[in-house]
């Protein structure tokens, strides 16, 4: 065997044997086999402490453990007398142990067992004793009752409050608190002494604000006892003034307290003495009084305080010296001082000592005829006396032994013989304590033994120091010699050094030191030898290690690590990065002589360490790798695309089960290739279908592919980067592998019946890479699940086989084995299947129904017997249907429903029933075939419930003062309706920032027959939210919620012209089209045109370009036009976006656009407000492309971009639009304003003057060229001009399009004036005047002028008197 770490253990044993040999003693090695064979006197291994205090509430355990051969027996003495354990039923002794157990569970007083116990362990070779164990029961006596009077004390006087705690075992811990259980604050003026008393150096007036109670905490019982509290009454010369005390620099003089020099309260006088035992802690204490409170300092006469052992405690009033020794004796003094003076107290410290060991006697093992000695030296103060015992008895009273001589603290043995074994006790004692030690003397004669394993193999690296170990044992102690290769010369000297512990050391192992070494151990009883084979190995060295490198990101650095090592040792090469194990991922490749990193990144920078190790040694080499990052500005503007396809696939290294595939990578298109996917296609099972074969890092261009037998392979490669996957490469040439027998069998084998007399066996067939050969087929075997049954088999090619004429639902054992022309697959697994099921023969009985609530019932039934199921029980089913409603004339659906209760159970719950209805129910049991017979039909009613919501709630606003509500009854009343409950509340828009304000909730209750209600508005701008519920006597039903329509004066968004410019024409990026329509009559808001949109949950802002005209009307409504651009910048592939349009209202906008990108392209809509608030909204692919932007800011100007999600917007390709202003209550009727009435009167007067001038000119015979346009009129119903230069949209009502009063329509559509041609009645009415005779020119002129203006502005306005006046002007 090979010995490495064990060498140290054996060397330690051999060294111990050698040491004891020098003092004529033998140490028995820690070998269980040897120790079990050698006789050994008893030795105490575990015992309780000398002063043993126990808890009276627990059982008592007094420990005593010992070892020896034979196993010792135990006995006890109590108070010096034999303690008979067998006579006391409460006392027992543990098996193979001397530990006493005193059990009080059955009663008894622990105090009765107090005393001094000692344990005796005996065997054939002697008796060992434990120390005397003083057993005491813990006590926590009560505090003596006493009356504590009020203590009167002058302010500034000293005071001590005595505690006098009851004596406990062990002594209690003392602390002071008030009666309200608050700790007493302690400082250098007020502190607790070592005796538990509370000392006041001087009393202050605030000391009387609390009382003082001494508390004692007892450790074992975990109890706290409290003394009656002290109450102080402080007599003072001046009344208490807190303000003056805070402002005064000396509170004592401020209070009129006389300042005094210090005096000692404890200890008294100027000197005292204290005795302490060696090894314990010494605590010296000085407490002084005085005004102000004095400071305490400590000194030692004639020297410094012991360094490293002293500690000041209790505000310097106590000095603790740890682990006192004789050197700490002397005089210590404490100095108490304040500004009035100082005083000193001297404490004389005397250190005594209980006995302590100088030389504790040790076990002595001797050979027959050898000499030895036991030494027992102890010290103490006073000096202890030494007493020897043998086997527990005084040595003076033991039988005489001529080979033994007692000389004070030493026993000398000469010429010992077999049979002289015994256990000796040494007792060292003085007035402060005692020590007891056991040491046995054992006389052994043992032939030599080699303790090391036989035929060891030691491997060592050349030129290293090594040592061959040969631990041995014997009595007398044997002598040991070393030989090499059976030569007679003893090895000692030169390169070899033999140690007495049996080790042979070589200062430098060389190749010629290899060989077989023999160690021979000899004593008078015999001789024994063992062989050790030494092999010298070559060292492990890194001949070429990694070097520091500086590389660019994305490159492929290689770190070298070439190792030379002994070929007979296994080499392991590991890599560390920054002194931590390196994880070798798919970007790294570890080889025998180095490490390659593909696509190195900044995170790869650091220290790399190559560690080459064998079982004997190791070597390492380190290098630092620096990675230079490519500047970001070099790649930022480069467009990233999917990589180009790999090309030029080539097959090489053709082998039976592998092939090497090589390819040339395509362009990565500015995104590094991260992976290559190799796919294959075969032409036998699934021709034309490609399967993934393997995946490789993006920095390789070849791969060794593992192949399956009998597959005609064809390969292709796909490159992958962060953008996506490339197109597949062109396929490689085909490669056919040879065949073999299948190695696996089909999986997923199942057996189940499709009819009651068959079983269909199915499985997952082998694929092309698993067939391994031609003519793949399957051997199907089956038999009844009976070890004695016969197997049936069938060979098939399809992945199924049907077995007929089977009993109903019996288990079968099934095996399916694959086979081809090269042979069969290994023996298949056995699966369990079942033949077909038949319908169950019995129905559940004793079906009972308990109604839980209006929609649920609880069912119980008696289960069917398992023999009647004829298959696997799947579930119990409860079929139920609604037979009728308890409401008259209410039609109900009688559709049958069922609830399943899986498994073998007899109870369940049916829920989701309609309340207030009659139901019928029947039950069946179901297996895999279907339902069994039905049980008896049960009928039950459901109680009344709450109704569903009303079918609808319609809201109409006939005017600004009221809202009409109309609703319908609930579809499911679920009981007798008792009425309706309507809750509603108003909300008005306060500001774009603060949102809406909600008013209080109003409640209305209606009878069950009422379905209409009118709400009177409190103001015309509020919107209302309505909550309507129907009600039965059970309670309110489901709610229907509706909100009143939008405000009446909000603009109605209407799309602008749908005209698209030619594709070759591009507008400026901010080009917009705006149309304005002016109406002369009030209009009612209409819903916006429905456009397919994507809901946007976030708050956004948009605007649109508008134009408006002011006319003489009661209400003016501005219609928003669509902002549009014909085309954005072209993408790299020629695709583009055009015709971006925005239909905007005050707080939302519909956005549409056209594009020729591929289907499935997602877009981003980005918009920025005039105050630079930016939002981006992703839009999923849809047709047509549109999105709705909600929660915009009224009156805000927006810039908007649309671009593909994988792209970024062009800086100039945007449109702008503006949202309309919000409605305010400051709108007034313009027709009632004084300035407007005055303006209209002035215009009428001006028209009259102009008409008079015209008539005067006519009367003078002027002629005008108006005959050609005599019958032409610009009617609001006229169509657009044919060139499509503008689009006219009228918002006028039908009344506006009718002929004016006193007019008629001609056959050609013109309007003929019936009255006088120069009549101005129509103008007085605000209508359109017409002059149709030759002298009538105003209408013709006005129409022509309006037409010209309309064509120039690409907008249309209704003809009005204002236009006519402007035309004439």
Swiss-Prot record:
Site (Cleavage) location in chain: 636-637
Keywords: Cell adhesion, Cell membrane, Disulfide bond, Glycoprotein, Immunoglobulin domain, Membrane, Repeat, Signal, Transmembrane, Transmembrane helix
Ranges where the Ig-like C2-type domain occurs: 42-138, 144-231, 262-350, 355-442, 448-535, 539-626
Composition bias type Basic and acidic residues, residue spans: 1266-1282, 1289-1298
Residue ranges, compositional bias (Polar residues): 730-739, 1300-1313
InterPro entries in the cross-refs: FN3_dom (IPR003961), FN3_sf (IPR036116), Ig-like_dom (IPR007110), Ig-like_dom_sf (IPR036179), Ig-like_fold (IPR013783), Ig_I-set (IPR013098), Ig_sub (IPR003599), Ig_sub2 (IPR003598)
Region Disordered, annotated ranges: 730-753, 1078-1097, 1266-1369
Primary localisation category: membrane
Name by which UniProt lists this protein: Neurofascin
Organism from which the protein derives: Gallus gallus
